[in-house]
Amino acid sequence: MAGLQLVTPASSPMGPFFGLPWQQEAIHDNIYTPRKYQVELLEAALEHNTIVCLNTGSGKTFIAVLLIKELSHQIRGENGKRTVFLVNAASSVAQQASTVRTHSDLQVGDYMSEDMTSWPEEMWNREMIENQVLVMTCHIFLHVLKNGVLPLSKINLLVFDECHLAITGHPYREIMKICEGCPSCPRILGLTASILNGKCDPCDLEEKIQNLEKILQSNAETATDLVVLDRYASQPREEVLDCGQYQDQSGLSERLLNELDEALNFLNDCNLSVHREDRDPTFISKQVLNDCRAVLTVLGPWCADKAAGIMVRELQKYIKHEQEELNRKFLLFTDTILRKIHALCEEHFSPASLDLKFVTPKVIRLLEILHEYKPFERQQFESVEWYNNRNQDNYVSWSDSEDDDEDEEAEAKEKTEANFPSPFTNILCGIIFVERRYTAVVLNRLIKEAGKQDPELAYISSNFITGHSIGKNQPRNKQMEVEFRKQEEVLRKFRAHETNLLIATSIVEEGVDIPKCNLVVRFDLPTEYRSYVQSKGRARAPVSNYIMLADSERTKTFQEDLKTYKAIEKILRNKCSKSAECNDFELEPVTDDDNVLPPYVLRSEDGGPRVTMNTAIGHVNRYCARLPSDPFTHLAPKCKTVEMNTGGYRSTLFLPINSPLRVPVTGPVMNCARLAEKAVALLCCEKLHKIGELDDHLMPVGKETVKYEEELDLHDEEETSVPGRPGSTKRRQCSPKAIPECLRGCYPVPEQPCYLYVIGMVLTTPLPDELNFRRRKLYPPEDTTRCFGILTAKPIPRIPHFPVYTRSGEVTISIELQKSGFSLSAEQLELITRLHQYIFSHILRLEKPALEFKPVEADSAYCVLPLNIVEDSNTLDLDFKFMEDIEKSEARIGIPNTQYTKQNPFIFKLEDYQDAVIIPRYRNFDQPHRFYVADVYTDLTPLSKFPSPEYETFAEYYKTKYNLDLSNVNQPLLDVDHTSSRLNLLTPRHLNQKGKALPLSSAEKRKAKWESLQNKQILVPELCAIHPIPASLWRKAVCLPSILYRLHCLLTAEELRSQTAIDAGVGAQTLPPDFRYPNLDFGWKKSIDSKSFISCPSACMEEDDDHCKLGTSSDSNHTAPESCSMEVSQPPEGAPNTPDEKLETLTLPVTDLNKDCFPNLPNGTQADSDDLPHRSDVCQCSQLGPLERDLSTQTTTSVSVRPSPAGEPQPWPSDECTGRSSDLCDPHVKKPTSKHCPKSETATSTPAPSETSSEDCRSACAGPAWDSPKTLGPNPGLILQALTLSNASDGFNLERLEMLGDSFLKHAITTYLFCTYPDAHEGRLSYMRSKKVSNCNLYRLGKKKGLPSRMVVSIFDPPVNWLPPGYVVNQDKSSTDKWDSDENKDLANGKASDDEDEDDDDEPEEAEVEPSKEDVNVEDDLEYYYEHIRFIDSMLIGSGAFGKKISLQPTDPGYEWKAPKKAHNSHFSPDGGADEFDYSSWDAMCYLDPSKAGEEDDFVVGFWNPSEENCGTDIGKQSISYDLHTEQCIADKSIADCVEALLGCYLTSCGERAAQLFLCSLGLKVLPPEKQSSGGSAELQYGWLKIPPRCMFEHPDAERTLNHLISGFLNFESKINYTFKNKAYLLQAFTHASYHYNTITDCYQRLEFLGDAILDYLITKHLYEDPRQHSPGVLTDLRSALVNNTIFASLAVKYDYHKYFKAVSPELFHVIDDFVQFQLEKNEMQGMDSELRRSEEDEEKEEDIEVPKAMGDIFESLAGAIYMDSGMSLETVWQVYYPMMRPLIEKFSANVPRSPVRELLEMEPETAKFSPAERTYDGKVRVTVEVVGKGKFKGVGRSYRIAKSAAARRALRSLKANQPQVQNN
């Protein structure tokens, strides 16, 4: 082996760093990274007449089109010249013309028919005027020239397609003759692909080229792809090794040859006459034996034996399937021969082990070469593993720049590694080329065998690939498909370096994507030039060897061939533009030039970083490679070297246009070209370092090492023991629940001034009839004067009125100051305190062991007490008399034990029972049930017939069951209702969270049920005690927890608002005295039916969102907004309030309405004036139309505004509103809805609130009403919405606001970064942006701002997680309420459950009338189930019985609900455990998942796994223990969401500037700070962003260059209807990074970064404000459907952006070309996905068309350009873009597209599984999705994401085809 000196990477002078074959692109160290050859050809063509010799047709068009575009400024305008494109055949005219049309906006004429030669001159003149580019056949052009129609002087460019024809006598020749005589001859471009065919003689070749050059007066530039490889890569070392003859000592080889030759002769002699169409019967046999013989001669007997074994197996298959007897005999004959060979071999060697005596010298030589590549010890195999693990993803999304920022960090890590030497240095990456398939297969076996026997070769992991079936166009059968797959797997492994040696047939020579190899062995010599060059070109690693193995007899002849090849190569290389000088010095040894110029040294110490002459070029290349670019562009520096007259050389270096160093760098004069290039690179490194583009190690600065540290205010990571990544959903932390300052420590003190507030309650929307199943009478709270008040020592700020939903309908609550400054005595206060405790402990039964009443210590302590009208003053005051009466009553706590006897019978007094709560005295003594008297049945007595057959009469029932005797058998009976156990009245029971009615079990059934006596609870007055608290007050008491909770939340929000007013200067710190925000409402009305609103969008804006949807009015008018719509129907005060009031009332003038409804509200009037106009009234009025319609069919109250589907009862709107929140999953569960609705629902619900907001937004922009609040800040209701998570199941949540905030945040930060760092390129900007908008950062800021404790995280469930005022959590006992302890939990809930059970009559026995327990007392069936479930759940929660499905769906299976997979964020803090969640636990924890629910009602079911989702911490599996009453547990990500939602809230209420100030106050800089003026307050003032000053570089004749570059853009401006004031922005928006001719502006990347955020914000804002009030789920889907590259690219093509696009990138050109063709055929927009389908039928081609990201980018960059050009006006951008996007927005809003992947996962959540990516042989990615039981589907694309969605699309198509019933939503 001595003769062979291989330079393996480790021994290379460049050091191990360059040996890594996988450095994705090797970086050259002493030549500038070469650019794509097409680019260089274009450059040449721009400089002089050129003949382009290319191998492919496509490359030629690219060069021709780009050249035409580059010179197009000469052909536009009045006396522009014309460009002529000549083709040889008429058939190619149309094709070339259409390519030019596609890629430019020039007018193209095509002329091909012979009769055009007879056209009169004026026709030609007209054509010349109309068209700028003329594509014609050479004959027509010749005619035109001869007739002088178009003089040559009017032509700027003449393109000859297939110009080699000019050598023969062809019209081209004559055309050129005419040109020769002409002084002003046009520029000439010749295109040819056929200069080299097969073997040709170098002399002929040279002559042919010279001849052509002469005729066309051009220089031939063969960047044929043939040389290109050489020219670029460092040349591999070529060796021809003569291996000598095989010495056949044993004679085995000879015997085998004889056998085979004899057999072959026999086959050849059988001259069977075969019909032409029949198969030759000996064909297979000959083929097999020839292959075997070839293996024998090339590899030797050992391999021939292996080959024979393989062949025998293959023959068996043929024999089995062969029908023809004769053919079969030949196959059997062959089989015998092969077996004979095997037998002969066995005599000489054992087939098991490899014996080198029986292989040829070539094989031995090959093994010796492989020995040389053995890695050093330390990195045997793990190195490969290490490598694979490191780079795994590189192979997948190697270029998918669209991946989100999430991956950026990961990527960064990877890149840095790639720049430094890896831990192992000498790894083989080699290919062995052989001629035949069998040679490859067997050689692979041999190498594997050798590896087993020779430890030195153990490092080799080889595989083979054969070209069989890789042909793209052959029909593929199953088996080929399998083969094909195998090959791809082989290639994948080779690319991933899992295998390091590939044995291949010529297939791998061209067109297959494989890594750069450092060893290429031609086992069989190349037979033609192309094969030589292609295989040599595979050795592209910087240190590589190209070894050709020859036998002695062929060595001589081959040496000759090799000379020929080298000569051809040389000729071609000389024709290669600019290549000559590179090669000369590439080959000479690296001399030490370092002393020519001193190195640039950073620090003088030894080994300090330095750049020397020799390393400078490498540094520049490496820098360029790190600039941002897309998969198609490899940025490289451009160096021009000129010879000076003085004799030296000077180079000028141009960096890619997106580098901040834009000025060309000119180097010193040196005495040779190579030194000049090195010197200029050295200078360039110095400049790059000085401007901060190279770091102090002189490596390119990554985007991470930003020089803008201040931007990334690096915060110390907080230390917490909490596991999980900060900012993620997985990490949860506890925080105390906030208590508003005004409620802290405000317990009244004797003799100190107090404030008394009245809790006003007005029924604004009575319950509609259809929901009033029991036909209960409604009890408007305003009918009785006694009510509750709040007594406190501190004033309470004004807050919006808000609704609660009782059994009577929607009640609007107001908190009004009644009197202040008075004081009370100690006795009075004690009485009040006792009564306060009595309300919470006895009436509401909220006291439990964990809570103690200690008003003085409690965090929030104020008194709740009864008020009544004082004598006749008509003013409310404290009702001391009533309090004293209660104290005295015996029924106050227990059950009085009055005994009635026959002597002292019971006497019935009707008036005692009119407004009474009664207690049965004969059961449940510890916690007696309390009932409202609903009706007195005077026609029934205890002797009436008992409803069920077991008992005759009621008296008998009581006697039998309880042994009770009645003293009065004539008393009437009482129909009673349970007092309410539902204490969460925040949202209505009958609606889901979206404000849609829940499907009810049919109304008729229910009515029937409640009307029959059987289903009523009937009690006997004598057996009951009357409670001292009247029913009317009791009903109000039930509302207290909800009212106080809502009050508390609104005050927290108000506090946040005034805090922000101080911090950010947005809004007023204190409100004007008479100001009140509009009511809180859920905005459902609006959304109820979008249609009604479309007419009046502004109508609904409510500003404060949540609250006031309708009521935007700022007054408190209690029109509860929600109620608004209903309100309409509500009669003026005097009218009887019965539900069936008919429509007329609707017509009331709105204003009165408001007044009437609240006649006595103090501030009822003010608002009307100003906001009504745009508030409810619109809704009201405009709604009348629709309302009327609806109403007529239903009773008024039900105004819900959406025509109800028949039979479905209308919900009461009011409820409606709330309902949303509750969205109960199961339709039936009425009651729970509100309270319990599973969190998830909430999620669904989200829409509501947000809806509201959207409106606001609009209003914000719009109406007058805004002025007032705008200056005050957002309505606390809206802030509350932003603080409410969907898990809280309230009537609103932050999701819609969050989406709006999210897009505004992105926009604000983007604009700030863009303006503040005019020099940072897009990669850096997006890195800074991703850091600032990351959830982790937002979470930090939100936490600093104190949001976690103010957020509303879990569902409000008074018995479980609400702390009544004046109570404290008793530490010792509190464990009972900790989330972790289960038993107590049960306790807690269990207990709750009883009282909750509103209807629970535990003892069915006494069903008074109840045959079936449930019927009886279920307030609504649901209520009952629900309670029940709750109870069960509470038990379950501890027991782990989660997997079971408890299905409670008595009715309506159609409404299936499915559960989600998300923890509803903080689900409520785990706490709620029991109760809380129970609801959801319905389906054993099934819960709705908003994220999945696509449309309103389809929810998705998943299973909730408490350990994960809920406890939040699943990480350490430890559960977080915390107190439910005073703490809440929140996922970090929810805090980040809340920050975005608050931003959305400020944005909609106060406008963009306020939102920016709000961000600055959080600590996110989005405005430049200003030095405050002396007079100003101390806090920081923020200025306005300034547009970056320069968009054009200093350049001698910038203006002229600009006009030259944008010639033709006028048409574009008129197309988009916007004229740029500064055209440089326009040019920049269309300049791709590869377009180096633009020397005056940057490329579009920065503008794209800006435009992307602007369009995202504008589109999101538009969708948010859509009157249809899309739900959050729909909003998300619409946003992703509209804001994505596919849509943008499609629109860009539709509006011709591609015709003005400036790029020099051949691959990009082709992708755009394909895409444009595709769009033209489709001619309609596509949804969601980046890979629009090509055509539905061609199933075989599972690849989708690729969407050129650059097209989407320029669509965005133009938006950025307009924004900057218009002085940062979003309106201007939207005026230009809305018309383009409108059709799509409308189309998608009507039918929301979902991404195929998501749709598939929703359709088959359990069964669809995506495979990891595989690489296909041409470098694309393939993904397979398996839908278990329904098949596997594959998709292919340039990135994993694209391939994945292609696979999903195929799967969907197939699934939908097979089951038509899959509804396509």
Curated annotation (Swiss-Prot):
Polar residues composition bias: residue spans: 1111-1128, 1192-1201
Binding site for Mg(2+) 2: E1648, D1753, E1756
GO terms under biological process: apoptotic DNA fragmentation; cranial skeletal system development; global gene silencing by mRNA cleavage; heterochromatin formation; melanocyte differentiation; miRNA processing; miRNA-mediated gene silencing by mRNA destabilization; miRNA-mediated post-transcriptional gene silencing
Residue stretches of biased makeup (Acidic residues): 400-411, 1394-1409
Residue positions binding ATP: L54, N55, T56, G57, S58, G59, K60, T61
GO molecular function: ATP binding; deoxyribonuclease I activity; helicase activity; metal ion binding; pre-miRNA binding; ribonuclease III activity; RNA binding
Top EC class for this record: hydrolase
InterPro entries on file: DEAD/DEAH_box_helicase_dom, Dicer_dimer_sf, Dicer_dimerisation_dom, DICER_DSRM, Dicer_PBD, Dicer_platform, dsRBD_dom, Helicase_ATP-bd
Keywords, ordered alphabetically: ATP-binding, Cytoplasm, Endonuclease, Helicase, Hydrolase, Magnesium, Manganese, Metal-binding, Nuclease, Nucleotide-binding, Phosphoprotein, Repeat, RNA-binding, RNA-mediated gene silencing
Start and end residues of each stretch annotated as Disordered: 397-417, 713-732, 1111-1142, 1190-1259, 1373-1417
Reactions this protein catalyses: Endonucleolytic cleavage to 5'-phosphomonoester
Transmembrane spans: none
Residues of the site described as Important for activity: K1749
Family: Belongs to the helicase family. Dicer subfamily.
Protein name, entry field: Endoribonuclease Dicer
Organism: Danio rerio (Zebrafish)
Gene behind this protein: dicer1
